[in-house]
Swiss-Prot record:
<feature type="signal peptide">
    <location>
        <begin position="1"/>
        <end position="20"/>
    </location>
</feature>
<keyword id="KW-0732">Signal</keyword>
<protein>
    <recommendedName>
        <fullName>U-megalopygitoxin(3)-Mo4</fullName>
    </recommendedName>
</protein>
<dbReference type="GO" id="GO:0090729">
    <property type="term" value="F:toxin activity"/>
</dbReference>
<dbReference type="Pfam" id="PF07648">
    <property type="entry name" value="Kazal_2"/>
</dbReference>
<keyword id="KW-0800">Toxin</keyword>
<keyword id="KW-1015">Disulfide bond</keyword>
<keyword id="KW-0964">Secreted</keyword>
<dbReference type="GO" id="GO:0005576">
    <property type="term" value="C:extracellular region"/>
</dbReference>
<comment type="function">
    <text>Probable toxin.</text>
</comment>
<dbReference type="InterPro" id="IPR002350">
    <property type="entry name" value="Kazal_dom"/>
</dbReference>
<comment type="similarity">
    <text>Belongs to the caterpillar 3 family.</text>
</comment>
<dbReference type="InterPro" id="IPR036058">
    <property type="entry name" value="Kazal_dom_sf"/>
</dbReference>
């Protein structure tokens, strides 16, 4: 029972780090590395999170700057599921 509590606390800490770092802000995500992580992972530098979310975030970033995914400098590394 204690371990479940610890896991919940750790999960909440990770989620709050994500949102504190504005991981979903397309203005700040730019061209994050596209890796093949199965589950969403958040890091302090906002660089690693779920592949699908990276792709979506990148697409939003590009559409805000008036570009398409084809015009993206980092689309070759994208591998959306």
């Amino acid at each position: 029972m204690n371990s479940k509590f610890v896991l919940i606390v750790v999960f909440l800490a990770v989620v709050s780090i994500c949102f504190a770092n504005e991981v979903w802000d397309p203005e700040k995500c730019g061209c994050p590395p596209f890796d093949k992580v199965e589950n969403a992972v958040c890091t302090k530098d906002r660089a690693t999170y779920d592949n699908r979310c990276q792709f979506d975030c990148h697409a939003k970033f590009l559409s805000k700057s008036g570009k398409t995914l084809e015009e993206s400098p980092c689309i070759e590394s994208a591998d959306p599921k």
